[in-house]
Amino acid sequence: MRVHFRWTTAYFIALLLLQVPAIEADQPTPVSPSTQNTPIAAQLLGTWRLVAVTEEEGGRVIPSPDYGLHPAGYLMYDSTGHVCVQLMNTTRPKWKDGDVPTPDEARSAILGFGGYCGRYEIHAAEHYVVHFPEADLWPNDIGQALKRTFELSGDRLVLKAVERRPSDGRLTTNIITWTRVK
């Protein structure tokens, strides 16, 4: 417990020292008109469960080396223009020493997890959505525009994005498949 308290305290001190702007809950978040009142928006709203994370490289589609064959996660779009997504590799090793990971265990935990929350905009005619992370595991993504093309078919949603793989920096097309939670 003491180590967990130290990490939590260090995290909040770092936020204060870096003067990270607070996200005020009572301030309205700007929502793009493209996000509201469209048939596509109505179809995207709700909670989605992760089915698969694959990569396309050189015409081949392979399971993501970072998230594995059986990833877990959720994606949520709400009617106020907010998105929250978390995905993880279910085979990440547990830490042998409880709350204190070895460097390899910490690396595996970080590279096998992805998550952020923020705003989103839908560009229905062009079949893409843009996520604007406000809180993100990857600090460099905060404030960026993350474009994902989408395909909707019934209760299935496929998001695609060209991105760098966290583990080795190579550019790949990520294909993330979701199913609607009912």
Question: Where are the predicted features?
Answer:
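Bacterial N-terminal signal peptides that target proteins for export
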Residues: 1-11
